[in-house]
Amino acid sequence: MDKNARICIIGAGPAGTSAAMYLEKAGYENYVIYEKSGRVGGKAFSPMMKVKNAHGQWEDRTIEMGAVMGCETYFAVAECEQFGGTTHLDGPAMGRRFMKVDGTPQESSKLELLKKFIKMKKLSHLLETKYKGYDVNGHRGVSQGRYEGPCPSPKMKLQHIEGENPNLKELSMPFSEFLKRNKCEDATLVWKGPFTSFGYGYFDEIPAAYVVKYLDSFTVRQFLSTGKLWTWKNGTQSIWEGVNRHLKHPAQLNSEVTGITRKDDKVYVTVNGSVEVFDKLIVCTPLELFLNYGDPREEEKELFSKIQHKEYFTMAVRTEEGNCPDISYYFFENMTNETRGHLMVFYHRWPDAGDQPLVTFTLRNHEGMEDVPFELARDTTLKDMELCGKKVETVERIDDWYYFPHVSCKDYADGWYEKVEAMQGKDNTFYAGEVMSFGDMEETVEYSRDLVRRFFA
């Protein structure tokens, strides 16, 4: 491809900013990033709020309203840190306590813990043997029993691998069925904590591929030992601010794309009322929104209209002064589809500080079931805080996210990803972002990295 090609990138979240970074590294410098909001980072959003430090003084510190953490297999994020001059070494230590909804500790017997550990080891072994290739970034080929892409294992460190494994077709079934098929149902709790509680859905609805690609056997062990998790003192948003700041062409903020016309081997982009002409287009925002502002072909309409997402919101809340807990709480009783709309987790960010905002996490939809209305879920979450002994005095802010775009088990099995991947480059258009991999920072950046390798090398 011509290194002077003019490239339009839509969206300055992790997918878009990292795509620009990898394009620069590959020798492409004639790009523009359009971001409709006034900041970069997408769901990596870390606003400043008042926290009472160890000396009893109020000071401004970052609070995470979206992305929170990483781990040792965040190889692509580490490349972004290096490029942008940020680090996770100064972040606050993670901690958690498993609680009942009434605020008393959730006790587990030694037998229960042993069963959980045995099933976790069994499932990890199965994933690494029977389902070899399961952890490769992205989804192309999975429904056909193939794997192809960067492998994020500690040994491979994003090296490209590919191969055939017919067993991978089973990853299209719901994760609950996948566990049952492999007689590993007791592993549910191990995977549920970092998956359902952070808004990615319930195991009876979500294809197993999403679960095990995000929480591969190494990563899930990292989540179990919170001391190994990465956090950022200046917030996850600082990673993408750092990348953006070091780009030759930082994102153009407050720049909304309202029209796209692809014709005569060019891409005409209407942004803030003006038309710009490009040679290539990389869409790093929700693909189904392209149906509104773009000029979608029939195949794009058919495929992108199948994308689903999660109704998930976070609230920064304050308890009465002096009643702030000293650690995050997880409520496994509320991580079921019957209890959607209830509080699943609140995140206590700063262990060295006293009173501070807590961030609540609530999921309110399930495929094929009625959504819990936002107002009801908000009020229920506040009641749940009171029930566990942490009554909320003030709500600092609420972020109602467009969250975890994905496809159903049926559409996954029917080759949705293979069909979309076959369109890459058609009409000079490339697709990236969360739905092409998974809705977390690392998976999304890995995909942008691999997209550049595949098509802009």
Short names for language-model regions:
Residues 24-50:
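Glycine-rich FAD pyrophosphate-binding loop
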Residues 73, 77-206:
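Mobile amphipathic helical/loop "lid" adjacent to a hydrophobic cofactor/ligand pocket
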Residues 15, 39, 288:
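Conserved Rossmann-like nucleotide-cofactor binding loop
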Residues 43-46, 52-91:
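Conserved FAD-binding subdomain of flavin-dependent enzymes
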Residues 5-33:
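N-terminal Rossmann-like FAD-binding beta1-loop-alpha1 element of flavoenzymes
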Residues 26, 258-371:
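Mid-domain catalytic core of redox enzymes
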Residues 347-457:
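Conserved flavin/dinucleotide-binding core of flavoenzymes
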Residues 214-266:
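Helical element adjacent to the flavin cofactor pocket in flavoenzyme catalytic cores
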